[in-house]
Amino acid sequence: MRIIGIDPGLARVGYGIIDEIEGKKIMIDCGIIETKSTKKEEERLVEISNDLSSIIKKWNPNSAAVEKFFFYRSSTTISVVQARGVIMMTLGKYKLPIQEFPPMQIKLAVTGYGHSDKNEVLNCVMHELSITSPPKPDDAADALAIALTGIYLK
């Protein structure tokens, strides 16, 4: 099984690709899709879709896990929701089964505690994937946690 985990955003979309083979989880790739704030929002959304399509074509995941947006008041809320919509549409275009998880559920699945901090989540991700260096940037590490959640809760 190969899964792509996605941490949505407009400026940066984190992604992480994990294989699960006979119970062992192996990180294949992780990184970010970054868009420039100097571009028009619609151009940034197209860039996210195009770059995500390239990642899907390259790694051919069987499924996807996406962080579910929970509402909070912020000047970027609408932009993030729009980016998430583009991400969901792009995943749908490739007919990938999608699981959605709110942040607390991701923390609970990865660490066993729904109120874990970022460092606790990161340490558990590194341990589970047997990696010695923290994935950078944080968005990529978060995407790996989301992918692991998709594996754990399939």
From Swiss-Prot:
TM ranges are: none
Segment forming the signal sequence: none
Which GO molecular function terms does the record list? crossover junction DNA endonuclease activity; DNA binding; magnesium ion binding
The active site lies at D7, E67, D139
The alphabetized UniProt keywords are: Cytoplasm, DNA damage, DNA recombination, DNA repair, DNA-binding, Endonuclease, Hydrolase, Magnesium, Metal-binding, Nuclease
Q: Which Pfam families match?
A: RuvC
Residues that hold Mg(2+) 2 according to the record? E67
Cofactor(s) essential for the protein = Mg(2+)
Record-level GO cellular component terms? cytoplasm; Holliday junction resolvase complex
Its EC top class is hydrolase
Swiss-Prot/TrEMBL catalytic activity:
Endonucleolytic cleavage at a junction such as a reciprocal single-stranded crossover between two homologous DNA duplexes (Holliday junction)
CDD domains (alphabetical) = RuvC
Q: Relate the assembly described in the record.
A: Homodimer which binds Holliday junction (HJ) DNA. The HJ becomes 2-fold symmetrical on binding to RuvC with unstacked arms; it has a different conformation from HJ DNA in complex with RuvA. In the full resolvosome a probable DNA-RuvA(4)-RuvB(12)-RuvC(2) complex forms which resolves the HJ.
Q: What does this protein do?
A: The RuvA-RuvB-RuvC complex processes Holliday junction (HJ) DNA during genetic recombination and DNA repair. Endonuclease that resolves HJ intermediates. Cleaves cruciform DNA by making single-stranded nicks across the HJ at symmetrical positions within the homologous arms, yielding a 5'-phosphate and a 3'-hydroxyl group; requires a central core of homology in the junction. The consensus cleavage sequence is 5'-(A/T)TT(C/G)-3'. Cleavage occurs on the 3'-side of the TT dinucleotide at the point of strand exchange.
Q: What does the sequence similarity comment in the record state about its family?
A: Belongs to the RuvC family.
Its name, as the record gives it, is Crossover junction endodeoxyribonuclease RuvC
User: What species does this protein belong to?
Assistant: Prochlorococcus marinus (strain NATL1A)
